[in-house]
Amino acid sequence: MIKEFKEFIMRGSVLDLAVGVVIGSAFTAIVTQVVEGLITPLISLIFVLTTGKKSADDALGALVYKVEGVEFNIGSVISALITFLITAFVLFLIVKAANKMKNRGKKEEAAEEEVVPTSEDYLKEIRDLLAAQTPPAETVKTDSTFTEK
């Protein structure tokens, strides 16, 4: 059982998945900080400039709704949505680039395979050249055998 588990863990796809999860987590943290540190303040600034409010809290106050003491923070949802979209888009670009490189490698392998002729190909070519140099002999049919004339 331990041997099977070791083979399972050492399989390339499991290791790739583990690396992807770790990198994805780290990347999500970076994107979250970019959204919270840059994009959200820019959106707040746009709200302040367009609405004429004195602070971002006043301008974004409409993004937090209170209904009977329950607070709905629409700004957090928008921030999470922006984070998700940026993360998904960057991961899409990474996967697209990886697939392109993978396909390029397959094309190069296919080109290499086509270039190398086999010994059977050489023998066929020799046979065809010899057949082209000597004219075919006439054959005459006698009872059950062919004889050359």
Swiss-Prot record:
InterPro entries: MS_channel, MSC/AndL, MscL_channel. It comes from the Bacteria. It is a multi-pass membrane protein. Keywords: Cell membrane, Ion channel, Ion transport, Membrane, Transmembrane, Transmembrane helix, Transport. Pfam families: MscL (PF01741). It is found in: Cell membrane. GO terms for cellular component: plasma membrane. The chain crosses the membrane at residues 8-28, 74-94. The keyword Transmembrane helix applies. GO terms for molecular function: mechanosensitive monoatomic ion channel activity. Gene3D superfamilies: Large-conductance mechanosensitive channel, MscL, domain 1 (1.10.1200.120). Channel that opens in response to stretch forces in the membrane lipid bilayer. May participate in the regulation of osmotic pressure changes within the cell. Homopentamer. Belongs to the MscL family. This is Large-conductance mechanosensitive channel. It comes from Enterococcus faecalis (strain ATCC 700802 / V583). The gene is mscL.
